[in-house]
Every structure is written in structure tokens, then in C-alpha cells.
Amino acid sequence: MNKIINKILLLFSVFLFFSCNEFQKLLRNEDVKIKYEMAEKYYENEEWRRASTLFEQIQPKYRGKPQGERITFFYANSLLNKKNYVLAAFQFESFVKSYPISQKVEEAAFNAAYCYYKQSPKHSLDQADTMTAIEKLQNFINFYPYSEKLEEANDLVQELRIKLEYKAFEIAKQYNTIRDYTSAIKVLNSFISEYPGTPYREDALFYLFDSSYQLAVNSIQIKRLERLKNAIKVYEELINDYPETKFFNESKKMMN
């Protein structure tokens, strides 16, 4: 059994070697038409790396010619499927600018915005790329209000906005974690005001209550009563807005 597997692996390695060797010869070939034909074949077979490499080589040769539109779109799409989102976004945007009346322009515009979406990092990192992605997707939504991709674009925008909200919430919550309650109250209040419909509002209200309560009970006598009143207001808002809050027992214990 092992001998059969080893033979299969050997044959596959030989095939791969000659296949790679043939592709290298193709890259050195100066016949642009042959490269174009092979790029199309690789594209049809979803061999995105080879297709994108060939399309990149021949794209300048066909600029301004009828084939240029098809090559640019296929090149961009190959990059997208290869997950090279930075270069794919650039190529799709170039397509939109170069071929504004193409039947593929709407698809290219969405794909460009989608590439920016894919560049959005996790919430703990800088969110400049997320802001750019939201802007690009919103531009698509505004320009193509009847697009078949409208719902998907809106969903992507919502997802990115929630990511920004979560980052803002985590920053605000951090002040509570390090027991800087004065700053926590200020930042959590700002968060709740800025994002009234956020899915993290319940959590923000609890940590606002906790910060207000901790600040009050650790205050000097002259400030304690007023600060306790403020904490009670936040507690009542939490319980009224979320009567089955996951923080009910913890909040009730502090109030007692």
C-alpha cells in the first residue's frame, strides 16, 4: 500500500515539475496571443495564480484595444480569487474608471468595495482601513441604489460599523477595568450617546452603573450621596430598558 502511495506521489511530483517548467517557458514566450489564450484557459480552470500572472504580463499590450476591457476585469477577478485584495481593489477601480459604460462596471464597483471590506482588520487593531471600507461600500450603495448587491453591501457596512462600535465599547470598558471610574463614566456616557442603537448598549449601561457605583462608595462623604443618586439613575435605566438583563443579579447585589 505504501509503495503505491509513494509511486502516486512520485508521479504527481514529476507532473508538477514539468507543469511548472512549461509555465515558466510560457512566461518567457514573446507571443502575446498565446499568453492571452493560456490566461483564459487558466482562468476557466480557476488557476488564479497563473491566470493573474499572465494577465498582468499582457495587460499593457492590450491597453486601448477591444480585448483590454476583458483582460482588465479577468485580471482583477483573478487577484480577488487569489485573495490579493489590495491589488484587486486597485484593478477593479481602474476598470471602473477606464470602462464606465461596460456591462461589468457595477460588478467591478462592488468587487472593489468588497476588497476594501476584506482588508478591514480585527477590532483590536487600527481601524483606518475599516473606515475606508465603509466609505467605499457606501459610495457603491449611493451610486447603485437598485443593485442586486445592495442588500449584501448594506450588510457589510453594518458588520463594519458594529466592529467599530465594539472597539469603542472595549476602549470605554477598559477604563472600568483599570478602575479609572471618572474617565469610565465620561467615556461610557459618550459611547451610549454616540451609538444609541448599538448591540453593546446593555453592557455599556452596566459598566456605567458599576463605574458610577464604585466612584460613589469610594468618595468622601460630601460627594457620596450625589454620586449614589447618579448611580441609581443608571441602574434604573438598565433595569427599565433591559428587565431581563444578564447583569440583573450582579446589579441587584450592588444596590442592596
Descriptions of predicted regions:
Residues 1-9:
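Bacterial N-terminal signal peptides that target proteins for export
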Residues 4-5, 16-256:
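Acidic, polar-rich low-complexity tracts and alpha-helical solenoid repeat scaffolds
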